[in-house]
């Protein structure tokens, strides 16, 4: 199940297409198959749940957070909690988090803060910044 979860994570389009509404795979945002620090790595996220989610104003489990990724980040629909997709992804995250302290806010969790720009907003400059820093995860058209 761990390998299946990794497969879903790196090739979501192939293994979970019916739940995805855009062209993304999980690893488009969670780099290096969910292992890279400062790109919301699974090893740091898994041990941080359950946690309050402002998006739905409740305390969610890690599995529920994964379901929300399908709905919000991937513009799709949430797989059922007992679906092999969710079970596989949770199993993979659990394996990556082996040895991590539960409840700790680990260094490298989440994404780094982006500093406020020194210049006022500009559409052309913004398009250039988006192309260089954002399109890899969010696609050419966001």
Question: What feature does the model see in each segment?
Answer:
Residues 1-7, 11-12, 51-122:
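Post-cleavage N-terminal segment of exported redox proteins
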Residues 17-67, 141-142:
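Gly/Gly-Pro-rich "capping" loops immediately C-terminal to redox-active cysteine motifs
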């Amino acid at each position: 199940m761990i390998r299946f979860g990794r497969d879903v994570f790196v090739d979501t389009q192939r293994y979970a297409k019916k739940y995805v509404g855009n062209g993304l795979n999980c690893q488009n945002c969670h780099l290096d198959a969910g292992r890279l620090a400062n790109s919301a790595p699974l090893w740091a996220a898994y041990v941080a749940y359950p946690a309050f989610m402002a998006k739905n104003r409740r305390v969610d489990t890690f599995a529920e957070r994964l379901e929300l990724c399908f709905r919000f980040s991937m513009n799709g629909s949430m797989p059922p909690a007992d679906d092999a997709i969710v079970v596989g992804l949770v199993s993979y995250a659990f394996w990556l988090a082996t040895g991590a302290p539960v409840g700790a806010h680990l260094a490298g969790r989440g994404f780094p803060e982006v500093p406020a720009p020194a210049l006022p907003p500009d559409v052309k400059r913004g398009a250039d910044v988006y192309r260089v820093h954002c399109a890899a995860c969010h696609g050419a058209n966001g």
